[in-house]
């Protein structure tokens, strides 16, 4: 009988902990994300806009690094347009992040941790898949080294 009770308590604890985990395409600091997981474009973008062609930007100033994350020096303006991140924000709501390389985001109610589940089609410029090890390496590089 004691074993049955212990198993029952274990199942209840596991069920409770699973119920408290949020899994979503986006995470909002307050309330819920504006856009659901099937949105095709944000409200402030014209989905019928002309696509393709060439765009040229000019910038006044100089740079001494291609690393946009460094605290030392000045990075190239617009360098962030060359890569994707785990999440991205929208310009019409504050404090919400939508999965970009991340297909889903998981977090507990107390927000003590966060997990990102990568899209299967997330690729580097050379066609190789982005792996969890790549994300971990990037995080550790930013967190543990002086850029």
What is the predicted function of each stretch?
Residues 1-9:
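Sec-dependent signal peptide recognition
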Residues 14-20:
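Sec/Tat signal peptide C-region and signal peptidase I cleavage site
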Residues 20-110, 117, 140, 147:
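N-terminal lobe/hinge region of extracytoplasmic solute-binding protein
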Residues 56, 131-138:
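Alpha-helical secondary-structure segments
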Residues 93, 123-124:
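Glycine-/small-residue-rich active-site loops that bind phosphorylated ligands and cofactors
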Residues 116-122:
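A structural micro-motif recognizing beta-strand termini
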